[in-house]
A protein has these predicted regions:
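A residue-level detector for conformationally permissive "hinge/kink" positions
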Residues: 7, 12-14, 19, 24, ...
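Short, charged/polar micro-motifs that form catalytic or ligand-binding hotspots
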Residues: 11, 19, 23-24, 31, ...
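Alpha-helical membrane-anchoring segments
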Residues: 2-42, 130-137, 199-200, 234-236, ...
């Protein structure tokens, strides 16, 4: 029965006990019946389709039609998301009932406003149309991105490996065991993680810095108006960007080949000793950085050239009148204005290079090998080590735990760089 002066507390409690009851109490019968129908559908699903997956998620034991631990885990994750969505819906239903009751009470002296709230504020089809349009995209993103991501994270808390592999075997929950194994001080795993993480950070910093420096140098040279055919030179320097990165990496793999590579052939013809590009730790890392600089420089050149052209000539003319040297103009005008534009791109590039799987995997395969390691080579970064653990050593749970740590490292790394570069404060200022 609709109340002419509903109380928000009563409306909220009614909706908490039964979805839609608070709306009916407020006089919104259609809305209340719809909410109640949604709750009824969920309760039916909870007793039928969701019961076994939720139970299996807790125990990972065969239940109902689920006999494979992987299927049990996947079904349990999907069921958990369904429950989470319903919980969100139920909370929204309570808030809506209480807020609507407050609106009716505040406008009690104006019957036409109360009537509008009860009869016109909720037009189901008009409200639902935008969500219907984006529903396919949301479903695709849910099953292609969210579910695999959640499945990979959850695996980190199991013992899923070659020796606990369905369908012949089953895996169980082990809590934080995999993380403790990787982070335990003094352990072989922790030493391996420290080595790989150290090189990973060095590679991200050096790769980003060298590519930016080379792009900046070339952009400054091409900015000189005394150089003829600047457009042609710029087009030539941009060609590596047009070539697929995989092709460029394979070309460098051939160039650095120790036995018959052109680089070593040239060194031998000059009477120098051949360089063990892929057999020595230091030279292997140098080859990775050189390849990275070749692939990344054109992008940096393009971005920096565009940023330089956006700086007004009047600024340089005023600096010249004030007696500033070219070096002072660069240090106090060009570079600060340039960094205000490219700093966000540098931070994103740094995060991307932290997970740059392709160059390492295709050029060195993570090698050369390191004695006594857990499969990680001298040029392995965290992502290639994750791949090696998961697809070569078949230690899927350990690989998942390492992937979670990689995610945490990248988030922290990016936040620190955003803070140091002032990008966050710049965005807040623009807002």
């Amino acid at each position: 029965m609709a109340r002419s002066n509903p109380k928000p507390q009563v409306a909220g409690v009614l909706s908490a006990l039964l979805a839609g009851a608070g709306q009916i109490y407020n006089g919104q019968r259609k809305k209340g019946i719809t909410y109640a129908a949604v709750e009824a559908v969920f309760l039916v699903l909870l007793q039928t389709a969701l019961r076994d997956p939720l139970y299996g998620l807790v125990t990972l034991d065969p239940v109902g039609r689920f006999v494979d631990s992987r299927h049990i885990l996947l079904a349990g994750i999907i069921a958990s998301f369904v429950v989470a969505i319903y919980v969100w819906f139920h909370i929204a239903n309570i808030v809506d009932a209480a807020s609507t009751a407050s609106s009716i009470r505040s406008r009690h002296a104006l019957p036409e406003d109360v009537r509008r709230i009860r009869t016109e504020d909720w037009a189901p089809m008009r409200t639902a149309v935008p969500y219907i349009y984006i529903a396919p995209s949301i479903l695709v993103a849910f099953f292609v991105i969210v579910i695999p991501l959640a499945f990979g994270i959850v695996l980190a808390f199991t013992n899923y490996s070659l020796y606990h592999c369905p369908p012949a075997g089953r895996f169980d929950w082990v809590g934080l065991t995999n993380f403790k194994k990787l982070l335990k001080p003094g352990s072989l795993w922790q030493g391996q993680l420290t080595m790989v993480l150290g090189w990973n950070i060095a590679y991200a910093l050096l790769g980003t810095g060298l590519a930016f420096a080379s792009g900046l140098g070339l952009a400054l040279i091409l900015q000189n108006r005394h150089i003829r055919f600047r457009g042609a030179f710029r087009a030539i320097l941009m060609l590596p960007w047009a070539v697929p990165a995989t092709v460029s990496i394979m070309v460098f793999f051939g160039l650095f080949n120790t036995t018959f590579g052109p680089v070593n052939e040239i060194l031998r013809s000059m009477g120098l000793r051949a360089v063990p590009w892929f057999q020595h730790r230091t030279w292997a890392r140098v080859s990775v950085l050189l390849t990275h600089v070749w692939i990344s420089t054109p992008f940096n050149l393009s971005v920096i050239s565009a940023a330089l052209q956006s700086i007004p000539d009047e600024v340089y003319e005023a600096a010249t009148v004030d007696g500033a040297s070219p070096r002072q103009s660069f240090a106090r005008i060009t570079f600060p204005l340039l960094m205000s534009v490219v700093a966000p791109i540098l931070v994103l590039s740094l995060a991307g290079n932290f997970n740059n799987f392709g160059i390492i995997y295709l050029l060195t395969g993570g090698g050369p090998a390191v004695a006594g390691s857990r499969g990680a080579g001298a040029t392995d970064i965290l992502m290639t080590w994750v791949y090696d653990l998961g697809f070569r050593q078949l230690q899927w749970s350990t690989a998942s735990a390492l992937a979670v740590l990689v995610f945490i490292f990248v988030v922290i790394f990016s936040l620190i760089n955003f803070k140091l570069s002032g990008v966050l404060s710049q965005l807040k200022t623009e807002e």
